């Protein structure tokens, strides 16, 4: 299988910055926003967006860590839920953040987990990469890159926090 870099570190960081600016533009009350990163790389993205928001708007937005494994309908897991939500999300605007949007099943599981902890006033979705091929009616509100793929290809997001570098790869035939 071939692996090809399609987004380098500079372009990836620009996409994250663009998402941050869109969050600022679309959310009049940033103090009501909670960033909810989907483990693992979504949490890293949420922290990066949180840092940029602090630099641009001088506001400290809380970051939640959402574990989808106990809520998946396609992969059964016996692992305990390791979700960490540091604030009450009831009546808050929660932005779910993940690295790749594909079938939508991870996002559905994240929403199920989220609403088991409270009732947000609104839930929106930010992803670094939208690769298409939805199986559920889920759409993104904030998007870094649209990277169309075939079902046999795979998008790999590498981040400094876990992989030592920032880049996006396509793995396929």
Curated annotation (Swiss-Prot):
Catalytic reaction(s) noted: UMP + diphosphate = 5-phospho-alpha-D-ribose 1-diphosphate + uracil
GO BP of this protein: DNA-templated transcription termination
Keywords: Glycosyltransferase, RNA-binding, Transcription, Transcription regulation, Transcription termination, Transferase
Motif (PRPP-binding): 94-106
EC number: 2.4.2.9
Alphabetized Pfam families for the sequence: Pribosyltran
UniProt xrefs under InterPro entries: PRibTrfase_dom, PRTase-like, PyrR, PyrR_bifunctional
GO molecular function, one term: RNA binding
Top-rank taxon: Bacteria
HAMAP family cross-referenced by the UniProt entry: PyrR
Function field: Regulates transcriptional attenuation of the pyrimidine nucleotide (pyr) operon by binding in a uridine-dependent manner to specific sites on pyr mRNA. This disrupts an antiterminator hairpin in the RNA and favors formation of a downstream transcription terminator, leading to a reduced expression of downstream genes.
Subunit relationships: Homodimer and homohexamer; in equilibrium.
Family according to the record: Belongs to the purine/pyrimidine phosphoribosyltransferase family. PyrR subfamily.
Protein name: Bifunctional protein PyrR
Native species: Streptococcus gordonii (strain Challis / ATCC 35105 / BCRC 15272 / CH1 / DL1 / V288)
Primary gene name: pyrR
């Amino acid at each position: 299988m071939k692996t090809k870099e399609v987004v380098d570190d500079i372009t990836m960081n620009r996409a994250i910055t663009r998402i941050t600016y869109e969050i600022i533009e679309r959310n009049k009350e940033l103090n009501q926003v909670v960033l909810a990163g989907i483990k693992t790389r979504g949490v890293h993205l949420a922290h990066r967006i949180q840092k940029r928001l602090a630099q641009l708007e001088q506001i400290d937005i809380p970051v939640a860590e959402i574990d989808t494994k106990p809520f998946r309908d396609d992969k059964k897991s016996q692992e305990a839920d390791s979700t960490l939500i540091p604030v009450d999300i009831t009546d808050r605007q929660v932005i779910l953040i993940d690295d790749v949007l594909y079938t939508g099943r991870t996002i559905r599981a994240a929403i199920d987990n989220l609403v088991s902890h409270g009732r947000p006033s609104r839930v929106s979705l930010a992803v670094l990469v939208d690769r298409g091929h939805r199986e559920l009616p889920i759409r993104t509100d904030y998007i870094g890159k649209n990277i169309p793929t075939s079902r046999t290809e795979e998008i790999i997001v590498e981040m400094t926090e876990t992989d030592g570098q920032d880049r996006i790869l396509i793995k396929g035939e």
